[in-house]
């Protein structure tokens, strides 16, 4: 009898931790644990050993698993007893094309047209100069029609609160999907009373600094949480290359040809030479990244997918993190289980690692 009462009390506590009538802003540890558990239990998650997985979700039930779409992408729809829907986006799997989506890191405009089977018009933010990762954008857009159709079905069934979540590649796509859906809501395509809240777990950088600023404004008031294990290298990629012309338009570096005469002729020459030498290496590095991770990977994907047409890539690789960052600081006990010098370079990135950290965090 005591055991039954204890179980009942635990269920009441867990259910009250997520309030469907008001999907509150800010980090909620129970919500996050459900998200990492959902990410860990896709219908098809090949090549992942049991020891790397988190437990099954406690509060959410799986309603739908999508077919494979885009560059070996998939998503699932979950629902809680309190009528919160969760859109869970799959992480990278072991297939070549799934990894090519990650490596297709040339940047494209955050608004435009994607050519994959059909022309897909998209807008992720208002800033026409903002740029995002090409591979993950294409992956998101390939799933977008299916996701929108299920959001519509949920809304007609009375569900208005949606959690968007993903781990690793799924987290990167979750950023872009969130921006896409917020713009759909702003344009009137989606109802105004729909609420979105996002948990990106162990996610890479989705776009440039301009997009990061736009995204953080769009999800202000703690509507998008980015959970990071500081020992995990994945949130540090793609590599960021900042050029002089990546700065905001009003900056001192744009006017080195207009230095005041009070500096003197020799000093002006020295300053111009310094800026020229500093800016040369980033320009070359960005150009090389665009060539290989944009054009060449795009060529491979065009051969893999007859209906895919690679985009025109922007001259930018100024990748930046975004969202409200939640740091899971590892404890001594964590390091005993997951050593820093592990030969497994995904040791600190897997579902189990993040789940264990969530049990120790003091949020």
Predicted regions and their residues:
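Short, flexible loop/turn elements at secondary-structure junctions
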Residues: 64-67, 81, 91-93, 168, ...
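A conserved cap/lid and substrate-binding interface adjacent to the catalytic center
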Residues: 63-162, 187-190, 195, 221
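Short, glycine/acidic-rich beta->alpha junctions
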Residues: 69-70, 173, 207, 219
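Active-site signature of alpha/beta-hydrolase-fold catalytic machinery across serine-
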Residues: 176-180
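Bacterial Sec-dependent N-terminal signal peptides
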Residues: 1-23
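Gly/Ala-rich beta-loop-alpha elbow adjacent to hydrolase catalytic centers
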Residues: 166-170, 174
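N-terminal low-complexity, Ser/Thr- and acidic-residue-enriched intrinsically disordered segments
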Residues: 21-84, 90-92
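Serine hydrolase/lipase
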Residues: 21, 118, 145-161, 183-363
């Amino acid at each position: 009898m005591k055991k039954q009462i204890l179980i009942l009390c635990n269920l009441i506590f867990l259910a009250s931790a997520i309030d469907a009538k008001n999907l509150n802003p800010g980090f909620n540890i129970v919500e996050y644990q459900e998200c990492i558990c959902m990410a860990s239990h896709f219908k098809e998650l090949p090549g992942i050993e049991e020891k790397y997985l988190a437990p099954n979700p406690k509060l959410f039930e799986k309603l739908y698993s999508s077919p494979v779409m885009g560059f070996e992408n998939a998503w699932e729809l979950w629902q809680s007893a309190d009528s919160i829907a969760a859109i869970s986006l799959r992480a990278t799997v072991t297939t070549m094309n799934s990894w090519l989506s990650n490596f297709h890191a040339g940047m494209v405009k955050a608004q435009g047209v994607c050519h994959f089977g059909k022309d897909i018009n998209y807008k992720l933010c208002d800033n026409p100069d903002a740029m995002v990762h090409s591979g993950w954008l294409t992956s998101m857009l390939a799933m977008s029609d299916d996701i929108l159709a299920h959001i519509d079905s949920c809304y007609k069934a009375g569900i208005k609160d949606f959690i968007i979540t993903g781990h690793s590649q799924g987290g990167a796509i979750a950023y872009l999907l969130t921006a896409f859906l917020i713009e759909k809501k702003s344009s009137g395509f989606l109802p105004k009373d729909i609420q979105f809240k996002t948990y990106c777990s162990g996610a890479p950088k989705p776009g440039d600094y301009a997009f990061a600023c736009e995204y953080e404004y769009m999800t202000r008031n703690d509507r998008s949480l980015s959970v990071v294990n500081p020992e995990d290298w994945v949130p540090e990629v793609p590599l960021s290359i900042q050029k002089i012309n990546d700065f905001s338009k009003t900056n001192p570096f744009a006017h080195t040809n207009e230095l005041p005469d009070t500096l003197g002729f020799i000093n002006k020459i020295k300053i111009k030479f310094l800026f020229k030498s500093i800016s040369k290496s980033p320009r070359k590095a960005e150009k090389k990244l665009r060539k290989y991770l944009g054009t060449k990977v795009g060529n491979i994907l065009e051969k893999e997918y007859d209906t895919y047409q690679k985009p025109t890539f922007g001259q930018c690789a100024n990748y930046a993190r975004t969202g409200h960052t939640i740091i899971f600081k590892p404890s001594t006990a964590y390091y005993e289980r997951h050593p820093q010098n592990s030969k497994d370079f995904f040791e600190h990135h897997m579902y189990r690692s993040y789940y264990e950290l969530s049990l120790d965090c003091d949020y």
